[in-house]
Every structure is written in C-alpha cells, then in structure tokens.
Amino acid sequence: MKHFAFPDKAWEKKVTIGGGLMAFLLISDVLGPEQKIASVSLLSLAISIHTLGVVIMMAADCQKYYTLKYHQGLIKEGLFKYIRHPNYLGEIMLYSAYAMIVQHWIPWAILAWVWIGVFLINILRKEASMSRYPEWKEYKKKTGMLIPKLF
C-alpha cells in the first residue's frame, strides 16, 4: 500500500531468485530454532510497538512525499521537527516487534546487519546530502537522528 501511495524510487530494487530464496529461508522455520509461544504481555508490547512503528513510518513517508512534491528542500515540520529520519525509526520499530515475538537471537542478528549495513549507510548518505542546505547545522542541533532530543 505504501509503495502505491508514496512511491520512493530509492527503495525499488529487483530481487534475485537467490535473494528471494534466502529471505524465505530466514522467515521460515526450516533453518530456525524451536518456536516459543510469546506471552500475552509480550504480544501486547510487540503489537503496540509495531502499530506505532507503522504509524510513524507511514506518516513520515506521506509527509516527505507530499512536501517534496510541492516544495524542495529540508523538511523541518511535522515528525521531522523532532527526528531527522522518522521513517527509519518507524521501520526499526516495526521489525523489532517481529523479532521480539520470535524470542531468539537470530532475528536480532539479522536486523543488526540490516540496520547497520543498510539503514545506517543510507541515513549517513542522506545526512551528507542534506548538509548542503544552509539551515542544516541549526536543524541538526535541534533534532535527533532517530530519537528526539530532549535538551
């Protein structure tokens, strides 16, 4: 749904057969450990984190898409007033919720690899790109990369 409402060419990539097979194996129980049943409190927490993550991600992507469609430049309103990369925060929350439910270290290891190898690299590239705007330094002082600055 997000792809059709707020397309982002930077994330459109073709998946190879090998990549698709690897993704299937990672999310299936073929290579995984015995499944634990998550407690009601853990499921409730995971659902809350997932839901909030989806809302943050969709709101940030919507805001970014429509703001940049009509006004190029640094976005400093809405969610971006507090966090420089709210869309990544939302995705991190979403995937963390899935890993919480599984209750095993393998999903966390995979997520750490994705967060550092993909998300962090893209965030740093985006920050380097945004640094060309004159208001960047002041904006960066007032906002957190993924978590709002309190002071």
Model-based region annotation:
Residues 1-33, 45-49:
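Intramembrane catalytic core of multi-pass membrane enzymes that act on lipidic substrates
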